[in-house]
């Protein structure tokens, strides 16, 4: 092989090495996105390769190597949302809107997306119950699940989303009552004090609207409860929400009087109460000076004249009072409010003459008085407007000749698109600038516009200009926009407008451009003029995506370009090789400091590199080698996943336990330093104490006090030979509870153990319980309190049931594990034994009306032998079962657990403040005859310090 060929091959190999180590996407993120790609029948075009951040996958936004945004609206995606989505732990935005072929339930572990701010699934076909785990998305601001097929009830846990701004579940099949908190543990929607939007319309929600739902502390501006099955009266507490601007309670089964306390909502712009079962008379609402729209149609109100106070509403634009048994003549000043545009009074008993007089609003366009008793009509001399008097006596006498005797005919021909452009090819549309293109199209649904007339084209021209100006201001790839086909839904009076958005500089959008435009609407980034009110945008399927624009007109040009690119790549590789060599040199220099943070530590001097220890000593390798007789087999007393545990004797005669990390468990130097600093701060008589460490000769060792009587598991199983009567079990429960409460509440920073079990509770020579195996893994972000959690992900039988949904372990997870330990102390059984789960066995067997709750056959024989002195037994069982409640919010804190055990001990005639349990004459025999207390299952170290966020396995 020639030297030139060899050099070329080396260069190629080097290039592939660079590529292999320089992927720009975090491994778990890449795996999650590839799972999406595999799950979807029609993944987005351009999702090629295995490095989404590096190859710029459509709709994917990254920061560094982490995926922070997925925006894939209106891409005709088909399939389900796989559980792998939960691995995108840095994701802030998930927008899959307007993909109607996306179906199935949302994965329960969607709650693992702890940094998610925007969850936008509008216009898909997702179904099933909204996952309870959504309540764990503490950063969530925007939750849009409308226009899907969700069923079931609203999860109460959504009340925990303290930052939620937008909550939209409209147009689904959600049923049941609105959840409110119970004031103690159960959350509810009344806790959403920062939320501005409750959009719950067009579902199957039922029951009374809870009075507890509303308070003066809320920030709501839109409450849209229309099209449900709510019953009862409007709660008075609603009037406390002074920020409300839109209230839609129409199309329900509400009863009682329309309350006068609605006058307190002085910022209200739109009030919809139509199609309910209200009775009584319409109250005076003259305090609502900002009211644009009032709709009280189709209620069984008492016969009454047209209220004169209507003319005192200065902002009123649309008035609907259809079918509410109005009678008598129309007051002469009725049409005088200066902003009044539309009046609908049909299906009443209004009599005499329709006379607009001279004091009529200059804005008035449309008056509908069909099906009344009008006998005469005097048109306004100075105003052209549309009046409908069909099915009134005046029309029966005049016949069908006058135009006002014809039923309404809506004009939907208005369009801002030009009609004088040259014809376009089939499928294309002419833009306002007469360019033929494939526009991105859809329908704007305005849920409560403050006008109802379809005749004033000025409003729609304003809308068209506002949308175009928005896209121009923020540099969207948009040439122009147009609106057309304006119509009103007669059922709910929503205003529907077709929108066309034309691409800039090309015939069609690419997927990125179209997603940007769609996101502006799905995320409500675009805000329409206020008169249009809240809206949703339902996009049409867009398939005319432009391909990547590559010039291929000349093969010679292609060859030339290829040659130039080849030379550039070669030079680039040579440059990279040089840079790589320099960086490797510097990296090697840095590695010394990172891998050995104690390298510059002079024990005789003060140094910033010295670990800040509290009572822990730095041992040399030679010191520990000597005290373990060269780590002899005789001193090998067990171990776990971290490595082996050796017994040693210090020169002063003190017994120590040395945990020696095996190669696969070694941490980074800085991580090890951080860990020993934190472990050295833990000082409590019920927690195994760190005496020191060794970071020498590429070894990492932790030195602990030696606990002679092994684990609680050994004693319960009979392995240790120690007899545990009821008194001793209570003292062990109290001691281990105090140790765990210390870790939660007094350690600095607080520590979440994450693997509480009987193997990790050790007993000293006095049977004092000591919590072990709380090796640290990472700080958990909490603005109020910083916790440290352990690497261990828990043990079957002790594992918090909520973990399976959230993949998160908390202080309440430790409480659950401790509750299982309490039941172990009671039964002497392992958590799972012969396929039976001790928690379920106790719950099933228990009968509170009988002695000892009828649990005798489950109790440990040692307890049965002392059954005559089981004072506090029932309270102990109650406490254990509270600790193993399915939901963490229903479990006590460890501080509360300790207080209850102290009370139980007092009931048993014991002093909860005594320092130790009773001694045992079997201690020496146990130590000699049962093997070492640090057996293979005991005291398993969990101290691997992950460099990045801990992910579920």
Curated annotation (Swiss-Prot):
Highest taxon listed in the record's lineage: Eukaryota
Stated regulation of activity: Activated by autophosphorylation on serine and threonine residues in response to extracellular hydrogen peroxide.
Modified residues (Phosphothreonine): 786, 789-790
GO MF annotations, alphabetized: ATP binding; kinase activity; transmembrane receptor protein serine/threonine kinase activity
Disulfide-bond pairs as recorded: 421-424, 434-436
Residues in compartment: Cytoplasmic: 580-953
Effect noted on mutating residue 773 to L: Loss of catalytic activity
InterPro entries reported for this sequence: Kinase-like_dom_sf, Leu-rich_rpt, LRR_dom_sf, LRR_N_plant-typ, Prot_kinase_dom, Protein_kinase_ATP_BS, Ser/Thr_kinase_AS
Residues with the Phosphoserine modification: 606-607, 942
Any one cellular-component term (Gene Ontology): plant-type vacuole
Subcellular localization(s) per the UniProt record: Cell membrane
UniProt LRR repeat ranges: 64-88, 89-113, 115-137, 138-162, 164-187, 192-216, 218-241, 242-265, 266-290, 292-311, 313-337, 339-361, 362-384
Enzyme class: transferase
Variant or mutagenesis effect after changing residue 659 to E: Loss of catalytic activity
Membrane topology annotation: Single-pass type I membrane protein
Tissue expression from the record: Widely expressed.
Residues spanning the membrane: 559-579
E.C. no: 2.7.11.1
Domain named Protein kinase: residues: 631-905
Family from the record: Belongs to the protein kinase superfamily. Ser/Thr protein kinase family.
Stated role: Leucine-rich repeat receptor protein kinase that acts as sensor of extracellular hydrogen peroxide. Required for intracellular calcium influx in response to extracellular hydrogen peroxide. Mediates hydrogen peroxide-induced activation of calcium channels in guard cells and is required for stomatal closure.
Protein name: Leucine-rich repeat receptor protein kinase HPCA1
Organism: Arabidopsis thaliana (Mouse-ear cress)
